[in-house]
Amino acid sequence: MADRYYLYGIFPAPGPADLPLDGLDAQTVQAQHLGDFTFLYSVACQKRYLSSRKNLLGHEKVLEAAMEQGHRTLLPLQFGLIVDSWEQVQDDLVDPHSEDLAQLFKRLDGCREVSIKVQWEPSTELEMMMAEDATLRAQRDQLEGTQLGMEQVIFIGQQIEAAMEARKQGIADQFRQALTPLAKDVLENAPQTDVMIYNAAFLIPWESEAEFSQAVDAVDASFSDRLRIRYNNFTAPYNFAQLN
């Protein structure tokens, strides 16, 4: 049976070659040149790959290894992409999208993606908000000490909920104001959990990461220990490598 190929990412030619690295199923990572582009791949040993943590990390490891070797301009491909032949890739991707691919590479050249995820502790923030806002505190106390009608209960609950949402957005805005001016592009993603209040990716010049990291730390420090921040400064540019 003919080999099938698992694809990791696309690079401007000549791209990486002879990476001393194994990909999924411990298969050797190889390079295939198609016109102005180079594809990193390995032989696919499965009909389809489950999106397990091991497989996802294996996919990402290949791209990070190429980046570490200096091949920083790349288009990561979605996990699980398997093709039957290079003719299929040429016909379905390279030929119809070569100009779009070239424009994406031009946009990404000299840039890196960094991401930030910010979490808070809702109960702590609620207590802080109540301590700061006498009106809301009085409304909450009404809920605890007075027999109220359903409409009043709903109204007070909505007031507290709206105030918490405004507080959440106020924190997110401080990150936006500090970080957006340092980026060439920004993409905000939906929060992944109930306690996540900000989730964004930034496309920044490669050499400006230290400045960006310092800006993240400065905003974090302004909130003392109230927030939990996950900052990733080394990843393939998944958020900014989308074909139109």
Regions found by a protein language model. Name each.
Residues 1-230, 234-244:
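An interfacial alpha-helical scaffold signature
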